[in-house]
Design a protein with these regions (language model features):
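Hydrophobic faces of well-ordered beta-strands that scaffold small-molecule active sites
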Residues: 1, 28-30, 69-73, 102-104, ...
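Charged catalytic cores and adjacent phosphate/nucleic-acid-binding surfaces used
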Residues: 1-2, 9, 13, 24, ...
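An N-terminally biased module of ancient metal coordination in phosphate/nucleic-acid-related enzymes
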Residues: 1-86, 158-160, 164-168, 192, ...
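Non-catalytic positions within long, well-ordered alpha-helices that form the structural scaffold/packing
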Residues: 17, 21, 95, 140-142, ...
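A sequence-composition feature that detects small, non-aromatic residues
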Residues: 20, 40, 92, 125, ...
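Extended substrate/RNA-proximal surfaces in nucleic-acid metabolism proteins
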Residues: 42, 47-183
Length: 264
């Protein structure tokens, strides 16, 4: 989940914690965004890791008798040649900090975000989505030191509504991505953001989750991707059903960068 330390969230860490307590959660992990070189104006958003740890560290102590707070980060990996060196430098600075949990995500490709319509304009949607998976493959091979790959099929969320692309067309490259993730000892998340918005499937698609499990993948975290309080812990019951159907018996929580497994 994301707080005001993320450029796209307006909810304070305190509100996230209070909401989680009201909903009966015993533990949460705040994973604010660090997308280097994005937005394009570097003065618009700068992730201040010292302020982040100071704030969440105080809240962890303040709330310790009511809920466990783990401190995480979602780092945005990129493959564009003109920014890779900058990303590498920032990643090297952040990955060694005492986070409990680090999500490595691909949000951006070709200096654009699939969330925005202009990412797709002037491009053949299938080719664009394939290029995004190719960028994701580069990222999971190039970067190390993260715990799980976030919302693996992120770009598929935002394919234009008038376009239908069969997910099975991407299974070959997805299999290669999953193989790299498993071989490196990392995992996946099931991201319930789409479920919270009324869609029938999470990210990644259950087809991908089943493939991951069949290939021997075991590390699976559950994230709401909440940017607003109303989505804290949203659709975790549905996520449990999906994971069980995909063959999982346990979900994972990271503490001090170590995975702990809990029965679903």
């Amino acid at each position: 989940m994301h707080s005001t330390f993320s450029t796209d969230s307006k909810v304070s860490p305190e509100i996230l914690l209070d909401t989680a307590i009201k909903r009966g959660l015993k533990s949460i992990t705040i994973t604010d965004h660090m997308d280097c070189e994005w937005p394009a104006d570097p003065t618009q958003y700068i992730f201040d890791e010292k302020e982040y740890f100071d704030k969440l560290g105080r809240l962890r102590e303040e709330y310790k008798d009511r809920i466990e707070l783990n401190i995480g980060m979602e780092f945005g990996f990129r493959n564009e040649e003109d920014v890779v060196d900058k990303i590498d430098k920032r990643w090297a600075e952040l990955k060694v900090l005492p986070f409990d949990f680090i999500i490595g995500s691909t949000h951006l490709y070709d200096h654009g975000d699939p969330y925005y319509p202009d990412f797709w304009e002037g491009h053949q949607a299938y080719r664009r989505l394939m290029e995004f998976y190719e960028a994701t493959l580069f990222n999971v091979e190039h970067y190390d030191g993260y715990d799980i790959c976030g919302h693996l099929d992120y770009a598929a969320r935002y394919v234009p509504k008038d376009v239908h692309i069969e997910p099975t067309r991407f299974l070959n490259i997805i299999e290669v991505i999953l193989k790299k993730i498993i071989e490196s000892g990392r995992g996946l998340e099931i991201n319930t953001k789409n479920l919270n918005k009324g869609f029938s499937m999470p990210n990644p698609n259950p087809m991908i989750l089943k493939m991951y499990r069949a290939m021997g993948g075991e590390i699976i975290t559950v994230g709401s991707d909440a940017h607003r309080a109303e989505f804290v812990g949203g659709c975790f019951d549905k996520a449990r059903e999906i994971l069980l159907d995909c063959g999982f018996k346990y979900y994972t929580v990271f503490k001090a960068r170590k995975p702990e497994f809990f029965e679903l």
